[in-house]
Amino acid sequence: MLEPLQILSICSFILSALHFMAWTIGHLNQIKRGVNLKIQIRNPNKEAINREVSILRHNYQKEIQAKETMKKILSDNMEVLGDHIVVEGLSTDEIIKMGETVLEVEELQ
């Protein structure tokens, strides 16, 4: 059986991980918005526009991959930690679902 201090320590770690992930997602969104705002095509032609769209598409795909990787890492860690966390009234699946819900809410913001 884990002591209350150990449970608090584990919960603190989980919250820190969630906060870091939310901060990273927000930071990636700010970068994307900044890239979108800084696009200036001097002599608009089809090639220049296509090149800029291609760069944006590539950056967006990298952002999506980073988010998916973070979700997978968090989910894996939550499953591992869920086996060691005993919170009265919550199952491992409920703890994992809480973590995923926090990520979804942060992603919507």
Swiss-Prot record:
<keyword id="KW-0472">Membrane</keyword>
<feature type="site" description="Seems to be involved in pH gating">
    <location>
        <position position="23"/>
    </location>
</feature>
<feature type="topological domain" description="Virion surface">
    <location>
        <begin position="1"/>
        <end position="4"/>
    </location>
</feature>
<keyword id="KW-0407">Ion channel</keyword>
<keyword id="KW-1133">Transmembrane helix</keyword>
<dbReference type="Pfam" id="PF04772">
    <property type="entry name" value="Flu_B_M2"/>
</dbReference>
<keyword id="KW-0946">Virion</keyword>
<comment type="subunit">
    <text>Homotetramer.</text>
</comment>
<feature type="topological domain" description="Intravirion">
    <location>
        <begin position="28"/>
        <end position="109"/>
    </location>
</feature>
<keyword id="KW-1182">Viral ion channel</keyword>
<dbReference type="GO" id="GO:1902600">
    <property type="term" value="P:proton transmembrane transport"/>
</dbReference>
<comment type="function">
    <text>Forms presumably a highly low-pH gated proton-selective channel. Trp-23 may function as a minimalistic gate that opens and closes the pore. When the environmental pH is lower than a threshold, the BM2 channel would be activated and selectively transport protons across the membrane from the extracellular side to the cytoplasmic side. Crucial for the uncoating process.</text>
</comment>
<dbReference type="GO" id="GO:0020002">
    <property type="term" value="C:host cell plasma membrane"/>
</dbReference>
<keyword id="KW-1043">Host membrane</keyword>
<feature type="transmembrane region" description="Helical; Signal-anchor for type III membrane protein">
    <location>
        <begin position="5"/>
        <end position="27"/>
    </location>
</feature>
<feature type="coiled-coil region">
    <location>
        <begin position="58"/>
        <end position="81"/>
    </location>
</feature>
<keyword id="KW-0406">Ion transport</keyword>
<dbReference type="InterPro" id="IPR006859">
    <property type="entry name" value="Flu_B_M2"/>
</dbReference>
<keyword id="KW-0812">Transmembrane</keyword>
<keyword id="KW-0375">Hydrogen ion transport</keyword>
<keyword id="KW-1032">Host cell membrane</keyword>
<dbReference type="GO" id="GO:0016020">
    <property type="term" value="C:membrane"/>
</dbReference>
<dbReference type="GO" id="GO:0015267">
    <property type="term" value="F:channel activity"/>
</dbReference>
<dbReference type="GO" id="GO:0055036">
    <property type="term" value="C:virion membrane"/>
</dbReference>
<keyword id="KW-0813">Transport</keyword>
<protein>
    <recommendedName>
        <fullName>Matrix protein 2</fullName>
    </recommendedName>
</protein>
<keyword id="KW-0597">Phosphoprotein</keyword>
<feature type="site" description="Essential for channel activity, possibly by being protonated during channel activation, and by forming the channel gate and the selective filter">
    <location>
        <position position="19"/>
    </location>
</feature>
<keyword id="KW-0735">Signal-anchor</keyword>
<keyword id="KW-0175">Coiled coil</keyword>
